[in-house]
Swiss-Prot record:
HAMAP family: Glu_tRNA_synth_type1. It holds the Pfam family tRNA-synt_1c. Keywords: Aminoacyl-tRNA synthetase, ATP-binding, Cytoplasm, Ligase, Nucleotide-binding, Protein biosynthesis. GO terms for cellular component: cytosol. GO terms for molecular function: ATP binding; glutamate-tRNA ligase activity; tRNA binding; zinc ion binding. The gene is gltX. It catalyses: tRNA(Glu) + L-glutamate + ATP = L-glutamyl-tRNA(Glu) + AMP + diphosphate. Belongs to the class-I aminoacyl-tRNA synthetase family. Glutamate--tRNA ligase type 1 subfamily. ATP binds at residue 268. One of its GO terms (biological process) is glutamyl-tRNA aminoacylation. It comes from Bifidobacterium adolescentis (strain ATCC 15703 / DSM 20083 / NCTC 11814 / E194a). A motif ('HIGH' region) lies at residues 21-31. This is Glutamate--tRNA ligase. The keyword Acetylation does not apply.
């Protein structure tokens, strides 16, 4: 295979793209990146986005995975124009319901001589390669290409059932990739390949191009891992056009690999590839989609943060880079934090509540079902917390102490390390100063003024040593929402009880 740059073709006028996952596991970031780029191309060109399911592998496919894929797309806001659950002119949109279509096309290919019956077993193919001095992994050798009817009958008499193979032409196969430019496969580099198993089951090598042809897909955007199958599909497409099944050859674009830790290709089994794990940790869809868009594409050289509307306006698959892209969790989290900060305060709260309920911090999983006090505290806390969290899963750690009415919060290990030898004296001085503050004056500014005078000006403590123990008393954490605002939210009784509680434990 050879690649030549600067030969990327123009897109057709009425773009039709598709997303066609197999339901074989939990949705992963590579799958979502494929869906996102196809969706963005369709929306940018005002084309059509088709969503179908490739579920012909009964051993690996599951209904649970099928439902998870739909759940993932719905959560991300990736909608489709034709396909699963919305219908369209070319259904059904699950391959498991299209068996008769594949049988009919396979029969036409066989009758026209584009496909042929192959009786060779894998063991026989390997033995012939070894005998001829070829590597065991050389692949199929074309042995069955020109079997006579007598030879076929003899194999059938032995109880053998044939697979169907496509007859590859003895010529180079080339195409202009939308991302990589001109790609050429030399004659003989791709052996005749199976499209129907001996038991009659159609393979991906048949079902995928047939579905694309019958659904009039004219732009195929998919992962680099499928690049080696493209010459097979191009040849099959030529045959389908001859048979009247397809009208035209689609354009192909192969997106770069997504790499994980250690510069290895990101695997479905790698934790960072699990879409729902990222959702559970508190990624919002805007942040995750923004980051996934950067895996091979950029909106501008000096800009990483953008909305999906902005992506749609600018996206062109021909701008996608061919080089592998690395999934950097830290950068993804950083971009997610930017999008969290851009949420309207009430939207931030609405999205945070399910995480707060999951973590046992509030009484219900929706804003409207919360108690009046919970809503009051969260509304006051939102402007303090929203700029400081990177993931919605971090909100509970920030607001838990504000919602709690406990008089003493056990400090976590990190917070305990911040308590120096001066902590008892600092707490004694803080308790004495704050005890004199009237309920009506228990406000952020007066609390700051009171503690600053008692601890810094009169006590001579540096701010970190002065306010650190007070912060630990209020939240049990080293990092928390702004201290004086937090003290106002919890109120004098709770704040004083926490200060005294920590002092008693030192």
């Amino acid at each position: 295979m050879t690649e030549v740059e600067n030969t990327r073709p123009e897109l057709p006028e009425n773009v039709r793209v598709r997303f066609c996952p197999s339901p074989t596991g939990i949705p992963h970031v590579g799958m979502v990146r494929t869906a996102l780029f196809n969706w963005a191309e369709a929306r940018h060109t005002k084309g059509t986005f088709v969503f179908r399911i490739e579920d012909t592998d009964a051993q690996r496919d599951s209904e649970e995975s099928y439902n998870q894929i739909i759940e993932a797309l719905n959560w991300l806001g990736i909608d489709w124009d034709e396909g699963i659950n919305v219908g369209g002119p070319d259904g059904p949109y699950r391959q498991s319901e299209r068996g008769d279509i594949y049988k009919d096309v396979a029969a036409k290919l066989l009758e026209a001589g584009y496909a042929y019956e192959s009786f060779s077993t894998p063991e026989e193919i390997e033995a012939r390669n070894v005998a001829a001095g070829r590597p065991k992994a050389f692949g199929y050798d074309g042995y069955d290409r020109n079997l006579t009817e007598e030879q076929k009958a003899a194999f059938r008499a032995e109880g053998r059932k044939p697979a169907l193979r496509i007859r590859m032409p003895d010529e180079d196969v080339a195409f202009d990739d939308l991302i990589r430019g001109r790609i050429e496969f030399k004659a003989g580099s791709v052996p005749d390949y199976v499209i129907v198993r001996p038991n009659g089951d159609p393979l991906y090598t048949l079902t995928n191009p047939v579905d694309d042809a019958m659904m009039r897909i004219n732009v195929v955007l998919r992962g680099e891992d499928l690049l080696s199958s493209t010459p097979r599909q191009i040849v099959l497409y030529r045959y389908l056009i001859e048979l009247g099944v397809a009208k035209e050859m689609p354009l192909f674009g192969h997106m770069p690999y997504v790499m994980g830790q250690g510069n290895k290709k990101l695997s479905k089994r790698d934790p960072e590839s699990n879409l729902f794990l990222h959702r559970d940790n508190g990624f919002i869809r805007e942040g995750l989609l923004n980051y996934l868009a950067l895996l091979g594409w950029s909106i501008a050289p000096d800009r990483d943060v953008f909305s999906m509307d902005e992506m749609i306006e600018k996206f062109d698959v021909r701008d996608v880079k061919a080089n592998p892209a690395r999934f950097d969790v830290d950068k993804a989290i950083s971009i997610n934090a930017e999008h969290i900060r851009m949420l309207e305060p009430q939207d931030f709260l609405n999205r945070s509540v399910p995480y707060l309920h999951r973590d046992g911090v509030v009484s219900a999983d929706s804003w409207d079902a919360l108690t009046d006090r919970e809503r009051e505290v969260l509304t006051a806390a939102a402007p303090l917390v929203q700029p400081r969290v990177r993931l919605l899963g971090e909100v509970a750690g920030m607001v838990g102490s504000l919602l709690s009415t406990e008089g003493y919060i056990e400090p976590d290990a990190d917070a305990k390390k911040q308590l120096k030898d001066s902590a008892p004296a600092v707490l004694d001085a803080a308790i004495a100063a704050l005890d004199a503050v009237a309920e009506g004056d228990w406000k952020t500014d007066s609390l700051h003024e009171t503690l600053n005078k008692a601890l810094v000006e009169d006590g001579g403590y540096k701010p970190r040593l002065a306010f650190g123990p007070v912060r630990v008393a209020m939240s049990g954490r080293r990092v928390s929402p702004p201290l004086f605002e937090s003290m106002e939210i919890v109120g004098k009784d709770v704040a004083m009880a926490r200060l005294k509680g920590l002092r008693e434990h030192l």
